[in-house]
Swiss-Prot record:
It catalyses: ATP + protein L-histidine = ADP + protein N-phospho-L-histidine. One of its GO terms (biological process) is cellular response to phosphate starvation. Disulfide bonds: none annotated. The keyword Cell membrane applies. It comes from Staphylococcus aureus. Residues 189-407 form the Histidine kinase domain. This is Sensor protein kinase WalK. By zinc. Zinc-binding negatively regulates WalK kinase activity and thus autophosphorylation. The modification Phosphohistidine is found at H192. GO terms for cellular component: plasma membrane. One of its GO terms (molecular function) is phosphoprotein phosphatase activity. The lineage of its organism: Bacteria, Bacillati, Bacillota, Bacilli, Bacillales.
Amino acid sequence: CTVILGFFIARTITKPITDMRNQTVEMSRGNYTQRVKIYGNDEIGELALAFNNLSKRVQEAQANTESEKRRLDSVITHMSDGIIATDRRGRIRIVNDMALKMLGMAKEDIIGYYMLSVLSLEDEFKLEEIQENNDSFLLDLNEEEGLIARVNFSTIVQETGFVTGYIAVLHDVTEQQQVERERREFVANVSHELRTPLTSMNSYIEALEEGAWKDEELAPQFLSVTREETERMIRLVNDLLQLSKMDNESDQINKEIIDFNMFINKIINRHEMSAKDTTFIRDIPKKTIFTEFDPDKMTQVFDNVITNAMKYSRGDKRVEFHVKQNPLYNRMTIRIKDNGIGIPINKVDKIFDRFYRVDKARTRKMGGTGLGLAISKEIVEAHNGRIWANSVEGQGTSIFITLPCEVIEDGDWDE
């Protein structure tokens, strides 16, 4: 009888409690799949049922937590901003790929290190100050690549107010800062370029007002200079208006099918007639090359390049024209070469920048606005082309222009 009673107690009380203890151990290890066997409908059975319900809810909660964690990890990984998260002591625990790319560092070189140290801010900030200061600021993150980021700090705070960590959001503003810098430079250049002729005109007009108009020799000279400066201002304003239209994409391009051989020869002939002191050498294929572009816009490009070549050639002035076509890619390359003074190698790539002049005094004296090549570049690129320069000091400069084209063989029009 005693044995039977002991077996009954073991089955109805001890065994369920042992099962629940074992399941508790499994739950502590992260295993929520097992369930406690229910041996009866008494209090122990109800406890086992409640335990199973608890285990199920914990399993569901854990699954939801894991799902949210994966979703959050995916969001952080694919964010366009850099994200750095730390513990309450400021040691980095989470960093996404964009932050690593911005910093130019590997994950193992960051995890566990102090955030302020990684961002080179340990001398400027303390963790406590991040809590109090919500202002963003600019930071040079990668000097080698010239990367600038706007950094925003925030804190991770529990309901009790206890700070458990910090987050830094890094937003790449390199391009934005460059655009802003170029805008400021552009405004400064425009102001300078307008002020120079206005100052000159004002001086001559004041001299005329003070009686120089009575001088039959000086008066015509002063009026001539005033007229030249006025014309230069008109050219500058027109160039600025054209650039503004291009920037706003409101400048219409009216493309036509053009016989390029005839087109370029006509332009060369016109310059050849007006420049008797310059020799024009042509290396243009006899096969007809057809292209599609706005003839007025491209005439402006070639006029500008040829005029520059004539201006800067020296001695026995010579301007060469070489046209080559690549039928494999349906592209043609036009090379216009002068025998001028050339351009220093460190300045060649800058000649297409707005208002850039290799020799400012000389260019201004020759009537240039400093915008011609910048406009030419905009026009060529709008035609799916490319323009660049190659130069050797003392030997001259070559301007290259590539454009889409097609070579038409004899008889193609009859098919």
